[in-house]
A protein has these predicted regions:
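Cell wall/extracellular polymer interaction/catalysis modules
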Residues: 24-188, 195-209, 216-234
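Bacterial Sec-dependent N-terminal signal peptides
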Residues: 1-29
Length: 234
């Protein structure tokens, strides 16, 4: 009876408690077995098995859902656990549940050779930074058509703008470089793309979409506030 009276009071007082079903493409972060199944279903429906690391994908999706000020249903994942010789950048259309792009992408020259193993948020480090970003506006600069990135994680990537970390095309990110040197060329910390595909990718992800740069680094996982709840359950 007490519960009934409380319920009547809440309704009459105008209090509304929303109940929503969890979804891998939604903006909520609700941890439940059904939600994990939903993410697995999304992964399967996009036919990502053998193409995308599921652990990286799930982290990217969970972070995407937790970032409320995103303006696009587009998610970009860069998987730095893979070598530069492999296509390790993925762009997903979360609304229509499909992968739009899969491309090579360079890492910072001081992050490693073929593999990126060291990361930094410091100016002049010439290293890549992990974590979640929001894309902003484009401009034409020294590297041509470029996309500004806003690092969302304090102490991890929040100096991205100060460091001029942007998405841009570069000749050293072209596939032909791999044939000559055994790995892709490296940037000063930017996620640089092959020149032929850089503009289409930038246009697809600009204007407030989420980007997640992943690597298997325990120190990042320990520091990330965006993924703290997720990692405790994985």
């Amino acid at each position: 009876m007490r519960n009934i009276l409380i319920s009547i009071f809440l309704v009459c007082s105008g209090f509304v408690v929303p109940v929503m079903a969890p979804s891998c493409a939604s903006g909520m972060l609700v941890h439940s077995p059904s939600e994990v199944d939903e993410c697995a279903g999304l992964y399967a429906s996009m036919q990502l098995e053998g193409v995308v690391n599921y652990k990286a994908f799930r982290q990217a999706v969970e972070g995407y859902r937790k970032i409320e000020n995103r303006h696009r249903d587009i998610l970009t994942l860069i998987d730095f656990s893979k070598p530069s010789t492999e296509k390790r950048l993925y762009v997903f259309d979360m609304k229509n549940r499909k992968m739009l792009f899969n491309s090579l992408v360079s890492h910072g020259r001081n992050s490693g050779g073929n593999y990126a193993t060291s990361f930094s948020n410091e100016y002049g480090s010439y290293k890549s930074s992990l974590g979640f970003y929001l894309t902003e506006t484009t401009y034409n600069g020294g590297n041509g058509y470029s996309l500004i990135l806003n690092g969302l994680e304090k102490g991890i990537n929040d100096k991205a703008k100060e460091r001029a970390i942007v998405v841009h095309g570069a000749s050293y990110a072209n596939p032909s470089v791999i044939k000559g040197g055994g790995r892709l060329g490296r940037s000063l910390g930017c996620p640089a793309l092959p020149q032929k595909i850089s503009k289409p990718i930038i246009d697809a992800i600009k204007g407030g979409s989420v980007m997640y740069i992943y690597a298997e680094k325990p120190e990042y996982f320990a520091q990330s506030e965006i993924l703290s709840d997720v990692l405790n359950e994985m």
